């Protein structure tokens, strides 16, 4: 039986997990709750046998998980993608945290009514954060070398999000531009991005000041 993956019908913090599943060509059944299905989720929430009921959830046979990072790490671990030794595993964990600094920075201001004001400070600091990844990729195809790991999909998603904040934010970072294109050119990712299953919008919940609503900005 295919694993079951549940979340809202938004990108949110689970888009990297979707990308990882697609890249691995994992068969999975996604339950994407739409904005008018809050009651449906409330009805399902305590019927799935989840120890800590929440979205996202991932049910793999009799093994049931919630929390986005636990889920993506579990899937990566099943495919021996968490590193071959303690140092490599620690580096991958470090990369997770570094990408999350960007993505969570967006989330901290995305729901605020003063988003346009707060965005200025975020974008002023963004080049410094992006430069660290640019330097990391100076002699690498992917963050951990020549093989894709789940932080690559986390970074791809973070770049996708910040480009909506400032479409010029990668202009000084050619390695990041190449990296983003490299991820998009992975065969399974290319197929997914062109499929009806791909969720382009919203980036956050529907009520977010930035990245919310039903349609992306033109």
UniProtKB/Swiss-Prot annotation:
Q: List the GO biological process terms.
A: glutathione metabolic process
Q: MF terms per GO, please?
A: glutathione transferase activity
Domain GST C-terminal residues, every copy: 85-203
User: Can you tell which superkingdom this protein's organism belongs to?
Assistant: Eukaryota
Top-level enzyme category: transferase
Instruction: Give the matching Pfam families.
Output: GST_C_3, GST_N
Catalytic activity reads: RX + glutathione = an S-substituted glutathione + a halide anion + H(+)
List the EC numbers from the record. 2.5.1.18
Q: Which UniProt keywords apply?
A: Transferase
Q: Which residues bind substrate?
A: 111
Tissue distribution:
Tegument and in subtegumentary parenchymal cells. GST 26 may be actively excreted by adult worms.
Residues given in the record as glutathione binding sites: 7-8, 41-45, 54-55, 67-68
Domain GST N-terminal residue range list: 1-83
InterPro entries, from UniProt?
Glutathione-S-Trfase_C-like, Glutathione-S-Trfase_C_sf, Glutathione_S-Trfase, Glutathione_S-Trfase_N, GST_C, GST_superfamily, Thioredoxin-like_sf
Q: Could you share any additional remarks the record makes about this protein?
A: There are at least three isoenzymes of GST in S.mansoni.
What is the role of this chain? Answer: Conjugation of reduced glutathione to a wide number of exogenous and endogenous hydrophobic electrophiles.
| Protein family per UniProt | Belongs to the GST superfamily. Mu family.
Q: How does it assemble?
A: Homodimer.
> What is the recorded name of this protein?
Glutathione S-transferase class-mu 26 kDa isozyme
Tell me what organism the protein belongs to: Schistosoma mansoni
